[in-house]
């Protein structure tokens, strides 16, 4: 199990990313825009750098919904590989069965 503080930190990152999403997209559009002047681009870069670090979506980490485990995460189920196996063996995931050949 992951520490509660790590799970809470991840929740804060998601909230910050949602809060600053529009502002971040506007600034990136100015930076990558062909019609923007160099001065406007530079000011947009400075504003982008002044945003909170955790507001960047790339700082988010996929974690297991049950345990908070960051590695072995399966997006389809929202669980780690260990929890997917446990729930599949109990038959709690519809349509998923153990492979045999």
UniProtKB/Swiss-Prot annotation:
<dbReference type="GO" id="GO:0019843">
    <property type="term" value="F:rRNA binding"/>
</dbReference>
<dbReference type="GO" id="GO:0003735">
    <property type="term" value="F:structural constituent of ribosome"/>
</dbReference>
<dbReference type="GO" id="GO:0015935">
    <property type="term" value="C:small ribosomal subunit"/>
</dbReference>
<dbReference type="Pfam" id="PF00253">
    <property type="entry name" value="Ribosomal_S14"/>
</dbReference>
<keyword id="KW-0689">Ribosomal protein</keyword>
<keyword id="KW-0687">Ribonucleoprotein</keyword>
<protein>
    <recommendedName>
        <fullName>Small ribosomal subunit protein uS14</fullName>
    </recommendedName>
</protein>
<keyword id="KW-0694">RNA-binding</keyword>
<dbReference type="InterPro" id="IPR018271">
    <property type="entry name" value="Ribosomal_uS14_CS"/>
</dbReference>
<feature type="compositionally biased region" description="Polar residues">
    <location>
        <begin position="52"/>
        <end position="68"/>
    </location>
</feature>
<dbReference type="InterPro" id="IPR023036">
    <property type="entry name" value="Ribosomal_uS14_bac/plastid"/>
</dbReference>
<comment type="subunit">
    <text>Part of the 30S ribosomal subunit. Contacts proteins S3 and S10.</text>
</comment>
<dbReference type="InterPro" id="IPR001209">
    <property type="entry name" value="Ribosomal_uS14"/>
</dbReference>
<feature type="region of interest" description="Disordered">
    <location>
        <begin position="49"/>
        <end position="70"/>
    </location>
</feature>
<dbReference type="GO" id="GO:0005737">
    <property type="term" value="C:cytoplasm"/>
</dbReference>
<keyword id="KW-0699">rRNA-binding</keyword>
<comment type="function">
    <text>Binds 16S rRNA, required for the assembly of 30S particles and may also be responsible for determining the conformation of the 16S rRNA at the A site.</text>
</comment>
<dbReference type="GO" id="GO:0006412">
    <property type="term" value="P:translation"/>
</dbReference>
<comment type="similarity">
    <text>Belongs to the universal ribosomal protein uS14 family.</text>
</comment>
């Amino acid at each position: 199990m992951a520490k509660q503080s790590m799970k809470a930190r991840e929740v804060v990152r998601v909230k910050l990313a949602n809060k600053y999403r529009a502002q971040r997209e506007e600034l990136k559009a100015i930076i990558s825009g062909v019609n923007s002047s160099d001065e406007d681009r530079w000011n947009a870069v400075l504003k982008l750098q002044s945003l909170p670090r955790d507001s960047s979506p790339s700082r988010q980490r996929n974690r297991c919904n049950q345990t908070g485990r960051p590695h072995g995460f399966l997006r389809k189920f929202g669980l780690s590989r260990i929890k997917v196996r446990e729930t599949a063996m109990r038959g709690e995931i519809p349509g998923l069965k153990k492979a045999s050949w």
